[in-house]
Structure formats: structure tokens, C-alpha cells
Amino acid sequence: LKKLHLYRDVQRTGKWCDLGQVRSAWNSTVLVLGLGDIGGEFAKRAKALGARVIGVRRTGTDKPDFVDELIHTDKLDEYLPQADCVAITLPGTTATKGMFDAERMAKMKDGAILLNVGRGMIVDTDALCAALENGKLAGAGVDVTDPEPLPADHPLWKMENAVITPHISGGYHLQETHDRICLLYTSPSPRDRTRSR
């Protein structure tokens, strides 16, 4: 949204350079696929930044307070053209494998941003590259890819409008996560093992 990755690239050249307009979460529409721990936390933050948040679930009808609207996955294609940002936080299953292929990306809003912190198998990486290259998508942020690890010569690495992290965006790199894991293994009491949040 703020082009920070591009400004980092320009910084290396030593140039003071304005890269033009940026986008804001305010008044945008964010579609969050999967409302588990990761999706729920992402949705809360998007809403706090002023976005209209649409949650997508396979099951369940109880709408959490942190989403403005809750839909089932069978209505996904109807809502894709509205979304400025699509955040995928789904697990990798036979039902989600290849869910975001070229056909589905074509249904997305022109200039949308695609985020994938779920599993790489959900997004067709070659279709993603094509959508980024032809301008269908304004950008992508992926913490997971297919294949994973992404080969060094894969074209996604060279996409200026993509940010790639090597499956590290989860909480496993936080000290508090390590502390909780240690507590699980060292505590004699099951009650102490859950005393982390």
C-alpha cells in the first residue's frame, strides 16, 4: 500500500525520489478468506484501519464483530470484484488446492492486492506472475509459494509489485512463541501450559 519495498530499492541508489500516490486501507474493501487465528487477527486490524471487512468461511453462520459481512465460500466469486485486497489465510487442503488460479484472479477487481499467508498450494504462482505483469493485480504479498521454497530463478522474485517472505510471517519468530513452547514442555501442570495469553 505504501510502496515501502520500492522506497527501499530506491534507497540503495542514494536518490531522493517520490514514487507517487499510495493507497490506504481507509474506505477500502478487504476480503479475508479464513477467519481462524490468523485471518481473525488480520480482519481486526484491517477494520481498525477503516476498511470494510468481508469474512469468508466454509461453515458457520455466526458473524464475528470484527467483520462487516460474513459470506460462505460458494459466494466468493460474487464478492471478488468488490475487494481492493484479498487476504488468504486458509489451510492447504484438497478443497483449497489451486483455488486462486488464472480464472479466479480474472474475477478480482482490477488493481487489487492479493495476500497469501495460508498455504502456497492455494495460489497458482504462474497465474499470479501473469496477473502482476499485465497489471490485473497492483501487487501481491506472499509468505508462502508453490513450489516452496521458490526457486531462485522463478520470475516472481523479479516482480517489482510483489513482496515475498520465506514462510516466516507467523508467530514462530516471536520470542513470546518460543517462551510458550518452553512452558508447554517444562510445566508439570496442564493448567500452566495454557497460561500464555
Label each PLM-derived region with a short phrase.
Residues A46:
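Aromatic pocket-lining residues of Rossmann-like dinucleotide-binding sites
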Residues L49-D65:
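NAD(P)-binding Rossmann-fold cofactor-contacting core
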Residues L35-G36:
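Glycine-rich Rossmann-fold phosphate-binding loop(s) that bind the pyrophosphate
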Residues G60-P155:
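Rossmann-like adenosine-cofactor binding region
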Residues E160-R180:
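Adenosine-phosphate binding glycine-rich loop
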Residues L1-T29, E41:
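Phosphate-binding beta-alpha-beta segment of Rossmann-like dinucleotide-binding domains, i.e.
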Residues Y185-T194:
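Conserved small/polar residues in nucleotide/adenosyl-binding loops
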